[in-house]
């Protein structure tokens, strides 16, 4: 059935439940999973030039620490049930682009994502990353 499942996560409760579901599906099908988290690069727009390096270093360190914690939890959950799991941390302006690129580069045959529904004016102004991946990626998706 599926051989390689990509699971994007931001560490939220909703994303963590999606990771758990992906692990369950991988266990049932014998698939391996790749868990990805995407962090945005640092932008130094109004920071004093002398402080940019310190701020950049702090931002990078925090992004790495956060990603390591998120991916570590996912990897441990997969290992606990003997599911082959790799992890990827990508810095990119657009999470949906990074997700699509990693899915294609790794030969993933399924992406499992949660749908975080926006309501009211927010729904008009913001498309969810899930919807953007659906629009731009040719890899089949399971929305949970």
Each model region followed by its residue ranges:
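Short, flexible loop segments at boundaries between secondary-structure elements
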Residues: 139-144
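Short, well-ordered secondary-structure micro-motifs
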Residues: 18, 45-48, 97-100, 123-125
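Small/aliphatic-rich secondary-structure junction motif
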Residues: 3-54, 77-86, 136
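Glycine-rich, Arg-bearing micro-motifs that act as flexible, cationic patches
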Residues: 110-136
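Short, hinge-like loop/turn segments at secondary-structure boundaries
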Residues: 50-54, 103-106, 129-131
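Structural beta-alpha unit
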Residues: 76-111
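A short acidic, glycine-rich active-site loop
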Residues: 54-69
């Amino acid at each position: 059935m599926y051989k390689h499942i990509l699971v994007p996560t931001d560490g939220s409760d909703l994303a963590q439940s999606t990771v758990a579901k992906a692990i369950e599906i991988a266990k049932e099908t014998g698939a391996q999973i790749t868990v990805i988290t995407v962090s945005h690069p640092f932008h130094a727009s109004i920071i004093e030039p002398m402080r940019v390096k310190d701020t950049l270093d702090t931002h990078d360190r925090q992004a790495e620490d956060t990603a390591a914690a998120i991916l570590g939890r996912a990897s441990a959950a997969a290992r606990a049930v003997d599911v082959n799991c790799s992890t990827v941390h990508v810095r990119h302006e657009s999470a949906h682009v990074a997700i699509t690129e990693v899915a294609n580069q790794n030969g993933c045959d399924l992406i499992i994502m949660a749908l975080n529904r926006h309501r009211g004016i927010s729904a008009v102004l913001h498309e969810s990353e899930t919807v953007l991946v659906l629009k731009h990626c040719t890899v089949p998706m399971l929305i949970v």
